[in-house]
Amino acid sequence: MKVVFTFFNLFFLAGTVLLLIFTVLSGSSKHFPLNKFYWLEADTSGIKNAPANRSAWTFWGVCDKADYSNCLLGPAYPISPEDNFGTTADIPKDFVDNENTYYYLSRFAFAFCLIALAFSGLAFIIDILGFCFEIIDKVVIFLITIGLLFLAGFASLQTAVVVLAKNAFKNDGRYAHIGAKSMGIMWAAFACLLICWLLIFAGTISNSYKKHIARVKAEQGQYSQPTHGPAGDESSFTRAAPPTKDEENTGGIRFFKIKRNQKVSDDESV
């Protein structure tokens, strides 16, 4: 059973790590399939310093949606046109009024994603040793729990900022479209890690319960072992007084025994 649990843990951990790697690599190349992953596509025509009339925000920056040839890239690149393009002219009003909201949501989401990937990858490597060492499960539970918390934070923050940005462009009369592939991969990674956490947590509880039951049965077996002393009618009191025959009701039997013996003696004398 432990081998089965470990196999499924590795399967879902590998899925989480792979999906997060796809998320991190989104927008890093103009070639298929990485050019299909983006958070938001929006109409940026007329905005100064925008890479194109139709721009796409990826994990690393904002690019020309047509061919990803013209990009503005950087670590923790926010979905905030005012910070991206260095101007407020023709920028949707909500981006200007709530600049800090878009800026910090995006940057914290970036950091949370990398932390979640690090903990998930480390848990995957260590969990391979779970086939040999039982104590590994406790270490893996800790790593997966931390990774799950940061991945939940990343998915929540990124979803929030993407939806807010889409609504901001829509309210300004501009086209905006959420990248379903990137969003789906992000939430699929969270689902895989959550399933992995539930499996390993359930397996640990099951093993602990089995050990507890075995320990209780062992203790009960020690207390229920029979003693070597006298039991029942074999006590010292019973053995001290050997059973006696009832002398009152054996007179007739003794009479016939005596008469029989006398008859045998008379025959011998004759």
UniProtKB/Swiss-Prot annotation:
Return the annotated region ranges for Disordered: 220-253
Pfam families in alphabetical order: SUR7
> Mainly localized where?
membrane
Q: Which GO terms describe its biological process?
A: cell wall biogenesis; cellular response to copper ion; cellular response to glucose starvation; cellular response to neutral pH; cortical actin cytoskeleton organization; endocytosis; filamentous growth; filamentous growth of a population of unicellular organisms in response to biotic stimulus
Expression induction per the record is: Induced by fluconazole and down-regulated in absence of GOA1.
Domain of life of the source: Eukaryota
Q: Which cysteines are joined by disulfide bonds?
A: none
Regarding the membrane, this protein is recorded as:
Multi-pass membrane protein
Q: According to the UniProt topology, which residue ranges lie Cytoplasmic?
A: 129-134, 206-270
Record carries keyword Glycoprotein: yes
Q: What happens when the gene is disrupted?
A: Leads to defective tolerance to cell wall stress and antifungal agents targeting cell wall components, defective plasma membrane structure, defective endocytosis, impaired lipase secretion, SAP2 over-production, increased adherence, aberrant biofilm formation, defective macrophage killing, and decreased virulence in a mouse infection model.
- Keywords carried by this UniProt record: Cell membrane, Cell wall biogenesis/degradation, Endocytosis, Glycoprotein, Membrane, Phosphoprotein, Signal, Stress response, Transmembrane, Transmembrane helix, Virulence
Q: What does this protein do?
A: Involved in cell wall, plasma membrane, and cytoskeletal organization. Plays a role in endocytosis and hyphal morphogenesis. Required to restrict septin proteins to the bud neck and prevents intracellular growth of cell wall. Contributes to secretion, biofilm formation, and macrophage killing. Essential for resistance to stressful conditions and for invasive growth and virulence.
PANTHER family found in the cross-reference section: PROTEIN SUR7 (PTHR36414:SF1)
Spell out the protein name for this chain.
Protein SUR7
Species whose genome carries this gene: Candida albicans (strain SC5314 / ATCC MYA-2876) (Yeast)
Q: Which gene encodes it?
A: SUR7
